Design a protein with these regions (language model features):
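N-terminal secretory signal peptides and thylakoid transit peptides that target proteins
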Residues: 2-19
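Thiol-based oxidoreductase modules, predominantly thioredoxin-like and allied folds used
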Residues: 60-70, 80, 88
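Thiol/selenol-based redox catalytic cores and closely related redox-interacting motifs
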Residues: 76-157
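Boundary at the C-terminal end of the N-terminal hydrophobic targeting segment
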Residues: 29-31
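Local sequence-structure signature of Cys/Sec-based thiol-disulfide redox active-site neighborhoods
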Residues: 33-48
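Stable alpha-helical elements in mature extracytoplasmic
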Residues: 42, 49, 66, 98-102
């Protein structure tokens, strides 16, 4: 019975294959979209919205500095204002926008300022905790254009 000796070349090929196998899951994993959020340090519903985003595949950095100045800098008209403002993938997010619609926005890439859920409707993400019971008010997610006009991107009833 003859055995062939393990050569240096075989060892290097085996090591390269093992390295590729171990690295493959990390190389193919999709990066979590990064969201920056500006909010009041005392706002509980903003924290709950951030938790909603994180649970739905986003990486979030929060700034407890308020959001009025950032809202204007991102081009989101005041009329669509809410308690927090965010930025993701070059878009502005205003208010309690569901993660589902943020993912859709990033996939569709419309020419727009971003999405807004004005006013803080009960039942929207972050406004859906036990303190609200089972109450769910209808609301619209608006696609805000660069000219300040908006259209319904998704209705929640």
């Amino acid at each position: 019975m003859t055995h062939s000796p393990i050569t240096r070349r075989h060892s290097l090929l085996a090591l390269a294959g093992l390295t590729a196998l171990v690295a493959a899951p990390h190389g193919f994993a999709a990066a979590r979209p990064h969201v920056e959020v500006w909010k009041s340090p005392s706002c509980g519903c903003c924290k709950d919205w951030i938790t909603h985003l994180e649970a739905n595949g986003f990486e979030v950095t929060a700034f407890d500095t308020g959001n009025t100045d950032v809202r204007a800098q991102l081009g989101m008209p005041q009329q669509y204002g809410s308690c927090h403002t965010a930025r993701v993938g070059g878009y502005a997010l205003e208010g309690h926008v569901p993660a589902r619609e943020v993912h859709r926005l990033l996939k569709e890439k419309p020419s727009a300022v971003g999405l807004a859920v004005p006013a803080m409707p009960v039942g929207s993400p972050g406004m859906d905790g036990p303190e609200y019971g089972s109450r769910k008010d209808p609301y619209d997610v608006l696609l805000v254009q660069r000219d300040g006009k908006a259209s319904v991107y998704q209705a929640y009833r």
